Curated annotation (Swiss-Prot):
PANTHER family: THREONINE DEHYDRATASE 2 BIOSYNTHETIC, CHLOROPLASTIC (PTHR48078:SF10), THREONINE DEHYDRATASE, MITOCHONDRIAL-RELATED (PTHR48078)
Source taxonomy: Eukaryota, Viridiplantae, Streptophyta, Embryophyta, Tracheophyta
Subcellular localization, as worded in the UniProt entry: Plastid, Chloroplast
GO (cellular component) term, any one: chloroplast
Protein name: Threonine dehydratase 2 biosynthetic, chloroplastic
Class of the enzyme per the UniProt entry, highest EC level: lyase
Temperature-related activity annotation: Threonine dehydratase 2 biosynthetic, chloroplastic: Optimum temperature is 60 degrees Celsius. Abnormally stable at elevated temperatures. Processed threonine dehydratase 2: Active over a wide range of temperatures. Optimal enzyme activity against L-threonine is at 58 degrees Celsius.
Activity regulation, free text: Threonine dehydratase 2 biosynthetic, chloroplastic: Strongly inhibited by 1 mM isoleucine. Processed threonine dehydratase 2: Not inhibited by isoleucine.
Cofactor(s) essential for the protein: pyridoxal 5'-phosphate
NCBIfam families: ilvA_2Cterm, PRK09224.1
Gene: TD2
Length: 595
């Protein structure tokens, strides 16, 4: 049976029906542990719910945003399979897909990418862990397959008119390359927030770049308008049978390269890649599990399979921007319902750890979305203690924005469990800091931030340590507690990882102070636009911003807002249009900054 538990975090008025997918009949004695998750994908506190698994019910598809779709999904245990019960599908249609996949001309532009045994991962997990290296393609991504397959089936008349698409990433390069090969003008509409390196890459492949809109949705709307106005064929990034079949050629290669595969793990954004690979495998090697992998903060396919129809996420975490899709495709969703075995969710720190794993294997750096499937496959093997099986994960791309590497590095050690981020509250007295260092003992410091302040009794120390064994870390925390030094493990709290170490030095003791995290676009005028909305009406007490090499960035703000003005403040924040969460949604952060 299929299931997914949705649990509310505190009280969010924008998501009043967050619990609608929790079965009302909680009579089962089976108790499962889930955790809250905020809009960033950070771990919150655990929630135990007795669950009775409920089947997916078929309901009409939707194409518009759904207001009651939660922006916050619970964390199932990383690597745990969220089961989908395949419904089958029309055998004649599936067979035609298979024929078209086998006859696809994608090798006019694509190579048969290598399937490489990851020896270090294999040794660590006790399996034969293979990585399908789609990052080795000319455009460093699998996306050229689907774009070329669809475009190669257009008539010469359609090609002569030209094609158009909207993309800020790998699909744009795939369409540009296909247009170059087919002697066809390829117009690519990209948001004005697109990094220059990606714009230059598309132009280098002959793409006619049109910069329009601040978001992908605005760029896509403009592309569709130009398609209608100028008679240009629109090339969707995933939701077209031609695109799906092109991506499905990866399945034929994996099947040629390796037999007796336990499971193939596939990153899921809009669903084109997994739909294509599943269509091939479930007809040729049906015993091989086809498992999709999504980030917790962009789990649109997972949620859609649970609901039985496509749903649109109101907020999407863009850390793995290549799979940050709010609404999966109509064709792709149908194929996933019919064919795949389930979904696995991964956190941003797990994705970062997977990037490091691939780097350790052969000094290659994947983009964040390119490592999603590897993170999911590793977590699945660890959760189910899989041994001596053939495991395949698709490395879908390597178009890493260089400025994002610092964030990946910050998270990688935490995601692998080889490093821990801790906060210790220590009574300010002579010799106490030396005592603290002694209690850390053999756990090697990798970073430490401490500043004496006379304004509060307890000092805050933020630090990272290397961890060989979890038991060593647990003992150290207990030793701290016995010495009256309360210690918190903040390793999976991304807000803390991003911001808190820069704020050590004491609370400001400001009356009516509230904190908020806003997810804002990375562009020049963002901060001014933001401040215009609040200042000088409310006093700014804190501001912390860091470019992440991403579509969006985290902006941490403090404001002085009297309680009587909170409704007015929230209305102003809502009008601004940026996803945000205020005050004490992140308990660990508030405990640390207010201590």
């Amino acid at each position: 049976m299929e299931f997914l538990c949705l649990a509310p975090t505190r009280s969010f008025s924008t998501n009043p029906k967050l619990t609608k997918s929790i079965p009302s009949d909680h009579t089962s004695t089976t108790s499962r542990i889930f955790t809250y998750q905020n809009m960033r994908g950070s771990t919150m506190r655990p929630l135990a719910l007795p669950l009775k698994m409920s089947p997916i019910v078929s309901v009409p598809d939707i194409t518009a945003p759904v207001e009651n779709v939660p922006a916050i999904l619970p964390k199932v245990v990383p690597g745990e399979l969220i089961v989908n019960k395949p419904t089958g599908g029309d055998s004649d249609e599936l067979f035609q897909y298979l024929v078209d996949i086998l006859a696809s001309p994608v090798y006019d532009v694509a190579i048969e990418s290598p399937l490489e045994l990851a020896e270090k991962l294999s040794d660590r997990l006790g399996v034969n862990f293979y990585i399908k290296r789609e990052d080795k393609q000319r455009v460093f991504s699998f996306k050229l397959r689907g774009a070329y397959n669809m475009m190669s089936n257009l008539s010469r008349e359609e090609l002569d008119k030209g094609v158009i698409t909207a993309s800020a990433g790998n699909h744009a390069q795939g369409v540009a390359l296909a247009g170059q090969r087919l002697n066809c003008v390829a117009k690519i509409v990209m948001p004005t927030t697109t990094p220059q390196i990606k714009i230059d890459a598309v132009r280098a492949l002959g793409g006619d770049v049109v910069l329009y809109g601040k978001t992908f949705d605005e760029a896509q709307t403009h592309a569709l308008e130009l398609s209608e106005k100028d008679g240009l064929k629109y090339i969707p990034p995933f939701d077209d049978p031609g695109v799906i079949k092109g991506q499905g050629t990866i399945g034929t290669e994996i099947n040629r390269q390796l037999k007796d595969i336990h499971a193939v793990f596939i990153p899921v954004g809009g669903g084109g890649l997994i739909a294509g690979v599943a269509t091939f495998f479930k007809q040729i090697a049906p015993n091989t599990k086809i498992i999709g992998v999504e980030p917790y903060g962009a789990a649109s396919m997972t949620l859609s399979l649970h609901e039985g129809h496509r749903v649109k996420l109101s907020n999407v975490d863009t850390f793995a921007d290549g799979v940050a899709v709010a609404l999966v495709g109509e064709y792709t969703f149908a194929k996933c319902q019919e064919l795949i075995d389930g979904m696995v969710l991964v956190a941003n720190d797990g994705i970062s750890a997977a990037i490091k794993d691939v780097y350790d294997e052969g000094r290659n750096i994947l983009e964040t979305s390119g490592a999603v499937a590897i993170a999911g496959a590793a977590a699945y093997c660890e959760f189910y203690k899989i041994k001596n099986e053939n495991i395949v994960a698709i490395a879908s791309g390597a178009n890493m924005d260089f400025s994002k590497l610092h964030k990946v590095t910050e998270l990688a050690g935490l995601g692998s469990g080889k490093e821990a981020l801790l906060a210790t509250f220590m009574v300010e007295q002579q010799g106490s800091f030396k005592t603290f260092v002694g209690l850390v003992g053999s756990l090697n410091f990798t970073e430490l931030t401490y500043r004496f302040t006379s304004e509060r009794k307890n000092a805050l120390i933020l630090y990272r340590v290397n961890v060989d064994k979890e038991s060593d870390l647990e003992k150290m925390i207990e030793d701290m507690k016995s010495s009256n030094m309360t210690t918190l493990n903040l390793s999976h709290n991304e807000l803390v990882v991003d911001h808190l170490k820069h704020l050590v030095g004491g609370s400001a003791n400001i009356s009516d102070e509230i904190f908020g995290e806003f997810i804002v676009p990375e562009k020049a005028e963002t901060l001014k636009t933001f401040l215009d909305a609040f200042s000088p009406r409310w006093n700014i007490t804190l501001c912390r911003y860091r470019n992440q090499g991403d579509i969006n960035a985290s902006l941490l703000m403090g404001f002085q807002v009297p309680q009587a003005e909170m409704d007015e403040f929230k209305n102003q924040a809502d009008k601004l249009g940026y996803p945000y969460e205020l005050d004490n949604y992140n308990e660990a952060f508030n405990l640390v900054v207010s201590e």
